[in-house]
Regions:
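Dynamic "connector" segments at or just before major functional cores
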Residues: 1-163, 169-189, 194-208, 233-236, ...
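Short acidic (Asp/Glu) and glycine-rich catalytic loops that position anionic groups and cofactors
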Residues: 1-3, 34-38, 78-82, 317-323, ...
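An anionic, glycine-rich sequence signature occurring as long contiguous blocks
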Residues: 2, 241-357
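Short, hydrophobic/amphipathic alpha-helical patches that form generic packing surfaces
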Residues: 19-24, 53-65, 329, 376-390, ...
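Short, solvent-exposed helix-loop connector elements
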Residues: 39-46, 335-342, 359-374, 390-399
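Short, conserved catalytic/metal-binding motifs centered on acidic residues
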Residues: 57, 72, 89, 94, ...
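Domain-level cores of phosphate- or acyl-group-handling catalytic modules
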Residues: 188-251
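A short, flexible helix-boundary coil/loop motif
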Residues: 385-426
Length: 426
């Protein structure tokens, strides 16, 4: 066994030194100044501490994976460093002030702060990376947050079988930057209020890139209204394509197989007893326009039908096993490519995991639904929604001599909005 050398030093060692980079990035944004303009009632605690200091403090906590208000007490051990690193002007607030101030901040600065974040991205020359085919992926999905054994407002049974919330999130680029999210009660169906979320997401994405977008959705969002939104965007030459896994509903797998068996041009035999049919057809979709006029269009439908008569172990089936996968798309990409691109949509699960585990935001800190919206996202229709959080993955580029240092930082930026979106800096 090697000997362990212990050295004594007078140097000051600081564990969360990466907060310095977060403070530098926030310093380029005007959102703190705009937040400070919100009036503070004389009835609130520590009113001499500005709203910007409150938000900057909480940002520092979240960057360390500590979303609970009480974690701010750890900063009191070295207040000078945290004030310097995060740009806090007056003092670090108490846990009580954090909780109270979150409930106080309104939504009047929503547009201003959204624009401030977009401007910050532009100043940092950020553009989400596209796929090899030129499309910038936008993955949208619902991910339940487990808040079991709690009496928090809005907590209810999710489709995962536990009590919690069901926020919807949108990631852009191959990096998986979180561009938009919205907190929802656990029992809410994933399609409810999604059309408005899609429109807002497209608008936010368009401020980050002019490249063609490829939006990917699960079968829970197989709805004509969603398809109509994407088609109308494509008609406006907005370069919006989509892949949505179809919900077969009452469609018969046997009828699908019989309809493609004779006409399919791409038939594969991976092994004995297994046949895969891949191809395309067109199905009509009717959706309503903004003036309530109905419009019917033929949408390209990709199919992947697998017929198994023998399992992998050589056992014969009495009745063939049929697996059906169909996908809506308006892209002109090859059939195989469309299927592979949808399967890559599953990578967004790892982004969910970063938020819920690495960042420890899955179990929200407050018992109030509105207060938890401060931390994650807010519903447009919630009249007294307060401050919310942008969760992003930041890459801060530093040029020194002729070297480039890329430092990836899990970064949180607050917004006062009804809906939350997240930005990423590269």
């Amino acid at each position: 066994m090697k000997k362990i050398h212990i050295e004594f030093s007078d140097e000051r060692l600081i564990t969360p030194s990466g907060l310095v980079f977060v403070g530098q990035i926030l310093g380029k944004s005007s959102f703190v100044k705009k937040i400070n303009r919100a009036p503070i009632s004389k009835d609130y605690l520590q009113k001499q501490i500005k709203n910007g200091d409150v938000l900057l403090t909480y940002i520092g906590m979240l960057c360390q994976g500590k979303p609970q208000y009480e974690a701010v007490r750890e900063m009191m051990d070295d207040p000078d460093y945290y004030k310097y690193a995060l740009g806090i002007s007056y003092a670090i607030p108490s846990a009580e002030t954090l909780r109270q101030r979150f409930d106080m901040i309104g939504d009047s600065l929503r547009k201003d702060i959204q624009q401030a974040n977009v401007d910050m991205l532009r100043e940092m020359h950020i553009e989400p990376t596209a796929l090899d085919n030129g499309f910038v992926p936008v993955d949208i999905d619902v991910t339940p947050f487990d808040n079991s054994k709690s009496n928090k407002e809005g907590v209810s049974r999710t489709y995962k079988g536990f009590d919690g919330y069901a926020p919807i999130m949108a990631y852009i680029g191959t990096e998986g930057y979180l561009v938009n999210l919205e907190l929802r009660i656990g029992k809410q169906h994933c399609q409810k209020e999604t059309p408005d979320f899609l429109r807002e997401t497209i608008e936010l994405c368009r401020q980050l890139t002019e490249k063609p977008l490829l939006i990917r959705l699960d079968s829970g969002n197989d709805a004509s209204e969603n398809i109509g939104i994407f088609m109308e965007e494509s008609y406006k030459y907005n370069n919006v394509s989509f892949i949505i896994k179809r919900n077969p509903r009452q469609e018969s797998k046997e009828e699908w197989l019989e309809s493609v068996r004779e006409c399919c041009q791409n038939i594969q035999h991976p092994r004995d007893g297994k046949t895969v049919y891949i191809g395309q057809t067109f199905r009509n979709v009717t959706y309503s326009l903004s003036d309530n006029e109905e419009k019917t269009v033929g949408i390209r439908t990709i199919y992947e039908i697998t017929e198994r008569t023998i399992d992998r172990y050589g056992q014969y089936f009495i009745v063939p096993d049929i697996e059906l996968g169909t996908y809506w798309t308006n892209s002109s990409l090859p059939d195989d490519t469309v299927i592979d691109l949808y399967h890559a949509h599953g990578e967004s699960e790892q982004y969910h995991s970063e938020i819920k585990t690495d960042m420890d935001v899955g179990r929200l800190p407050s018992g109030k639904f509105e207060s938890n919206k401060l931390v994650l996202g807010a519903d447009k229709k919630c009249g007294d929604a307060t401050c919310i959080i942008i969760i992003g993955n930041l890459c801060f580029r530093i040029r020194q001599d002729q070297c480039k240092l890329f430092i990836r930082i899990n970064f949180f930026v607050f917004l006062i909005v009804f809906n939350v979106f997240s930005d990423s800096i590269d």
